[in-house]
Regions:
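Histidine-dependent nucleotide/RNA phosphoesterase domain, centered on the 2H-phosphoesterase fold
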Residues: 2-245
Length: 245
């Protein structure tokens, strides 16, 4: 059973969708939340981050993004006039969970965490990346379904608690997404929303989650860069091999 998601004002959207399985419900929910944004913030103006800091995160990365990259670059070209910071080809990722600042997590804790995640109770799975919606600080793809991503987040969060790392937001506040461009200034949101809307008719792109990556994350030149500590394989299953239409 997947953990329940709660309304959380620090999350976006603050309330979860009515269904964690139904793509139409999730995509529409993301879009309606973005339509209600009046002002977008500078994504890089964030307390607790500087170019000198390093933090451990669980992410899903895309060494060979293929069709995802084609769809991303198509959308980025259509939004180029907005002057946002596009996510580069080698920077595409799905953020799953913060582990903690490098200076707050010992090498022994990292090794313990990796040992605990060698047999996660989550099988490999497929999701779809749907163009296009956004948040208060970014333009991003909606991901569907949420349920396997929520289960993965919960498993990683449980492992982190067992390893005694600082950890990140609880699973109840998790909102899966895939960012493709960051707002680099405060701006009126309606112009961004209007530019995004025509891209919503593009078909979704299938993504295959067969690994989860523990990375050392940093900010560099208004983008995110990372060093992969280890890619942890997710066990295969008959269900995970079922292709999504």
């Amino acid at each position: 059973m997947s953990p329940e998601l709660d309304t959380d004002p620090s999350a976006f959207p603050s309330a979860p969708p009515a269904s964690l399985d139904d793509p139409e419900v999730i995509v529409e929910h993301d879009w309606r939340a973005f339509q209600r944004v009046e002002r977008m913030a500078d994504h890089w103006d964030r307390p607790g981050w500087s170019d000198r800091q390093r933090k451990y995160y669980w992410m899903h990365t895309f060494p060979d993004p293929g069709q995802l990259l084609q769809r991303t670059e198509h959308c980025q070209r259509a939004l180029q006039h907005l002057g946002m910071d596009p996510v580069p080809a080698d920077g595409l990722h799905v953020t799953l969970l913060r582990v903690g600042a490098v200076d707050q997590v010992s090498t022994a804790q990292v090794e313990h965490l990796l040992d605990l995640t060698q047999e996660l109770p989550v099988s490999a799975f497929h999701v779809l990346a749907h163009p296009l919606a956004g948040s208060r600080g970014a333009v991003r793809f909606s991901l569907t379904p949420w349920k396997p991503l929520v289960r993965l987040h919960a498993a990683l969060h449980a492992a982190g608690k067992q390893a005694g790392v600082p950890g990140g937001a609880p699973t109840t506040a998790f909102r899966p997404h895939l960012g493709i461009a960051y707002s680099n200034q405060e701006r009126s949101a309606p112009a961004v929303i209007d530019a995004v809307e025509p891209l919503r008719s593009l078909p979704p792109v299938p993504l295959h989650f067969t690994t989860v990556d523990l990375v050392e994350l940093r900010r560099q030149d208004r983008t995110y860069r990372w060093r992969t500590i280890r890619s942890v394989p997710l066990p295969s299953s008959a269900t995970s091999r079922t292709a999504l239409a």
